[in-house]
Amino acid sequence: MGLGVRELFDNNIKVHFAGSDGGEIFYAALLAAQTKYRLFSCYKYILKCRPDDDFRLPADHVIRVQDTVNRHVIQDSGLFTLMFGAGKGQMQTLESLTEWQDKLIAFVQQNNLRCTCVELDCQKVLGVREAWYFRERMKKLLDNPQINVFHFEDGMRGLDSMIDFSDYIALSIPELRIIKPKTFREDTRYLTHYIKNRKPEIDIHLLGCTDVKMIAQNSFCTSADSTSWLSGVKYGWFDDGNQKAHINQFRKDLIEQRLSAVRTITEGSRGLELTDKTLLYGARASLCATICKQKYTRAAGSQE
């Protein structure tokens, strides 16, 4: 049987807001926007640690608080950043990634996190066999729900094995976009239907899916994640689905209302003193998150 996550989420896909990774202003922005689904990376929390270190965060740390105030939180393994981002160029081995997995497990267990955890999908750097080693090992050592990630290296036979093994499976949308740039939407739709037809109770996650059209086409999936809500404060421009506008053009009354809400959270609930510039950044990001939530609701149903 699956995790029953779709029952928890009602009957349609829920988009998890990614990219905050424990930052106070991002936490306040998303809370003020009344979003209820998050995805964060454990990368910075385990990078410089050893497996036997103390991974405990303060009880009021954002990572621990968001684990309880949201309907669902997904923890990414940070493996992509380790392999292709900040850690690019470092030689990874079975031993080094075993240590990474040990640290990930210790971090989750010591902080009593209830989040769903993404596996160490190392197919591209170590191979499919090694990915299965980590997949089976993590299922044995960690009680949390887990997401297993399909990559092209697995092949369709490997996908069948993953479906049989998994309760919750993810498709990497950025990978599909790169490998099949002209047909990735159709390929995603084919794969999601294939997975559901083979195992109707399985949960499906669309990893890194920023495409609202794809979210609508695959609304029967369980979850997706996106950093689109941060594009406005990162690039200055934001698309609400009808028109593209600069964040400086947001209505002043809406900015003031959201600024007040963000300040109440940061100064009142969190006990922080942030600069006016940071608070304005948070208010704008929060409004972008609200717009995204509205877009997802129109495309795929309630995001409550």
What are these regions (language model features)?
Residues 33-38, 69-70, 141-144, 163-170, ...:
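Glycine-enriched alpha-helix->loop->beta-strand junction motifs that scaffold or abut catalytic
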Residues 10-14, 70, 75, 140-147, ...:
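Short beta-strand/loop segments at the ligand-binding rim of alpha/beta enzyme cores
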Residues 89-96, 154-164, 209-223, 269, ...:
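Catalytic cores of alpha/beta
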Residues 173-175, 210-249, 283, 291, ...:
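Glycine-rich phosphate-binding active-site loops on the catalytic face of alpha/beta enzymes
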Residues 148-179:
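Histidine/lysine/aspartate-rich catalytic loop segments that bind and position anionic ligands
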Residues 49-63, 123-138, 155-157, 176-194, ...:
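Active-site-adjacent beta->alpha loops and helix N-cap segments on the catalytic face
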